Amino acid sequence: MKGTPSFGKMNKGGSHIRCRRCGRNSYNPTKHKCAACGFGKSKRITRYSWKTKKVNGVRLK
């Protein structure tokens, strides 16, 4: 897939699938890395306070 006609095919489906390490729907199969836990990029799970959603006013751990 190369060139201008192929750009029309990029809107089908999502860009992220379920990650097999953290279970969240944030693994990018094109980049081979998870946006949530960093699977495929680092061996350690990346955790940031600004990256987790608040549930009942308390941040997820």
From Swiss-Prot:
Keywords: Metal-binding, Ribonucleoprotein, Ribosomal protein, RNA-binding, rRNA-binding, Zinc, Zinc-finger. Binds 1 zinc ion per subunit. It holds the Pfam family Ribosomal_L37e. It comes from the Archaea. One of its GO terms (molecular function) is rRNA binding. A zinc finger (C4-type) spans 19-37. Zn(2+) binds at residues 19, 22, 34, 37. The keyword Zinc applies. Its cofactor is Zn(2+). GO terms for cellular component: ribonucleoprotein complex; ribosome. One of its GO terms (biological process) is translation. The keyword rRNA-binding applies. NCBIfam families: PRK04179.1. Belongs to the eukaryotic ribosomal protein eL37 family. Binds to the 23S rRNA. This is Large ribosomal subunit protein eL37. It comes from Metallosphaera sedula (strain ATCC 51363 / DSM 5348 / JCM 9185 / NBRC 15509 / TH2).
